[in-house]
Amino acid sequence: FVKSRGGYLTSPWHGMETGVYVVPTDGKSIPRKVADDGSAPQFANDNDVIYLTRTKYTGEVDWSTSLFRVKLDRSEDVAIAKGDFVSAFSVSRDGKWLAFNERFHAYVMPMPLVGKTLTVGAKADALPVKQLDVNAGDYLHWSGDSQKIHFSLGDELFTTALTNTFGFVAGAPKELPK
């Protein structure tokens, strides 16, 4: 979970020791701080690692968001991906895929851990990137087996299988749906 300072409508009184925390689900342990800053923490295939986002504002309306891989023992804090105008990242449970929102659209791409930061975006060309939505998409999340990505637009929920998105995925049809 993320502990942040108050502001606008909330009181800053309980905003000490802000950061990203983990807490065991047994209810008997106290929360442990794993990062000083970040948002949207999520687990993937390794329970000793969380992924979190950090946003850097470069102007009044310009920003860059990065996805970081952080070990729970705080021994590693590495940028995995970054993109201008990206508002959210979602790592698949198996850690092999990355979905992201850029300018209200939903995209998905492979996520190899290559030792350097991947630049993501609608026009990224280092790896294949596919747009999932027609008009817009938000609230990205993965199926438990990492084979489907879910997103919403207003009150509608959409699901896209990776086999219908990329031709190189095992089980993909010869001709992908449009």
Where are these regions (language model features)?
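Tryptophan-centered short beta-strand motifs
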Residues: P31, D77, A126-V129
